[in-house]
Curated annotation (Swiss-Prot):
Metabolic or biological pathway, per its Swiss-Prot or TrEMBL entry: Cell wall biogenesis; peptidoglycan biosynthesis
Catalysis performed (reactions): di-trans,octa-cis-undecaprenyl diphospho-N-acetyl-alpha-D-muramoyl-L-alanyl-D-glutamyl-meso-2,6-diaminopimeloyl-D-alanyl-D-alanine + UDP-N-acetyl-alpha-D-glucosamine = di-trans,octa-cis-undecaprenyl diphospho-[N-acetyl-alpha-D-glucosaminyl-(1->4)]-N-acetyl-alpha-D-muramoyl-L-alanyl-D-glutamyl-meso-2,6-diaminopimeloyl-D-alanyl-D-alanine + UDP + H(+)
Protein name: UDP-N-acetylglucosamine--N-acetylmuramyl-(pentapeptide) pyrophosphoryl-undecaprenol N-acetylglucosamine transferase
Keywords, comma-separated and alphabetical: Cell cycle, Cell division, Cell inner membrane, Cell membrane, Cell shape, Cell wall biogenesis/degradation, Glycosyltransferase, Membrane, Peptidoglycan synthesis, Transferase
Biological function: Cell wall formation. Catalyzes the transfer of a GlcNAc subunit on undecaprenyl-pyrophosphoryl-MurNAc-pentapeptide (lipid intermediate I) to form undecaprenyl-pyrophosphoryl-MurNAc-(pentapeptide)GlcNAc (lipid intermediate II).
Gene source species: Alcanivorax borkumensis (strain ATCC 700651 / DSM 11573 / NCIMB 13689 / SK2)
InterPro entries found in the cross-reference section: GlcNAc_MurG, Glyco_trans_28_C, GlycoTrans_28_N
Predominant subcellular localization, coarse grouping: membrane
């Protein structure tokens, strides 16, 4: 059996990229893909670049905001549900799969109203509001981190990552080929992380010395936050707004210093690279700390809260492992935690639901 699968994801790359990986798998199995996103969402252009049709709902954030947003939220939600229901009636999908984002909630609710089965995939160690609600309506619930939903019916499939990352050479062989000073890859995310851009260069010099090699992804329009600091310190650093080839960057690095979004944690594990996670302290439900602990509690990563990001704490965390051979051991343990076939597992369960099994 084939048919149309409605993929509901948007808002951040952490929702969209895992959804794209599963969509690619479903497409190879003969399903047509229709994407459901939000008007003016980042997913619009990205999804079209991957060759998928996208429909957009008039919907925005439901959680947080001022009194006006709280008062209008029920009406905006109802409007989005009605829009989604009209689309579903017209296109008759055999399955709706929600990954999170503004459109996922209204789309999932509309799907259930139209008697279309729903599958939910939660990327983080703590489910977001939309997925917590949708999981009560879903036929199958999928977890990126085992135990996220806290009930045995949920299926742990991991977080899908790009195949170029899972295809990287094994860490021990890769690290053995690295030459020169330690290679440090700093990832601030697509929007950048001010504390990593402004504070980390001086801390790296103080803790690891001048011989290190640095690549620093600082976020759109934020090169001026980091590049002049490296230059003033005399540190060898390549600063860029974005990194197009993440697989190559992970393969180059001995150590990654980054936030702990679900996708980043999954990529670190899949690549097999040592990482120091500095979780975003304002993340909802502190989910980034819990994401990072999935690896750090297994000796497969390092974890340092942002409030402790100073020379003394950073030295205490990094100096005991600041040798390429020791970092390679952490990288090996990280890769042992990866689920390389996550996209295939998720697609198989989706296919079974779509086929009524």
């Amino acid at each position: 059996m084939s048919g149309t699968v409605l993929i509901m994801a948007g808002g951040t790359g952490g929702h969209v990229f895992p959804a794209l990986a599963v969509a690619d798998q479903l497409r190879t199995r003969g399903f047509d893909i229709l994407w459901l996103g939000a008007e003016n969402g980042m997913e619009g252009n990205l999804v079209r670049q991957y060759g998928y049709e996208i429909a957009e709902l008039s919907v925005s954030r439901l959680r947080g905001g001022g009194i006006k947003r709280k008062l209008t939220a029920p009406f905006n939600l109802l409007r989005a549900v009605l829009q989604a229901r009209q689309l579903i009636r017209a296109r008759q999908p055999v399955l709706a799969v929600g990954f999170g984002g503004f459109a996922s909630g209204p789309g999932g609710l509309a799907a259930r109203l139209c008697k279309v089965p729903v599958v939910v995939h939660e990327q983080n160690a703590v489910p977001g509001l939309t997925n917590r609600l949708l999981s009560r309506l879903s036929t199958v619930t999928l977890e990126g981190f085992q135990g996220a939903f806290g009930h045995p019916q949920a299926c742990w499939v991991g977080n899908p990552v790009r195949p170029q990352i899972t295809a990287l050479e094994e860490p021990a062989r890769r690290y053995a080929q690295h030459q020169g000073g330690l290679r440090v890859l700093v990832l601030g995310g697509s929007q950048g992380a001010l504390v990593l851009n402004q504070d980390l260069p001086e801390l790296l010099l103080a803790v690891l010395g001048r011989d290190i090699q640095v690549r620093h992804q600082c976020g759109a329009g934020r090169t001026a936050e980091a590049a002049p600091i490296y230059q003033a310190l005399g540190l060898q650093a390549q600063v860029s707004e974005f990194i197009d080839d993440m697989a190559e960057a992970y393969g180059w690095a001995d150590l990654v210093i980054c936030r702990a979004g679900a996708l980043t944690v999954a990529e670190v594990a899949a690549a097999g690279v040592a990482a120091l996670f500095v979780p975003l302290p304002s993340a909802v439900d502190d989910h980034q700390t819990l994401n990072a602990r999935w690896l750090s509690e297994r000796g497969a990563a390092l974890l340092l809260p942002q409030r402790d990001l100073g020379a003394v704490s950073l030295a205490g965390t990094l100096k005991p492992v600041a040798e390429r051979g020791l970092l390679a051991q952490i990288a090996e343990r990280a890769r042992e935690q990866a689920m390389a076939d996550s996209a295939e597992r998720a697609a198989t369960l989706c296919e079974e639901v779509a086929n009524g099994r």
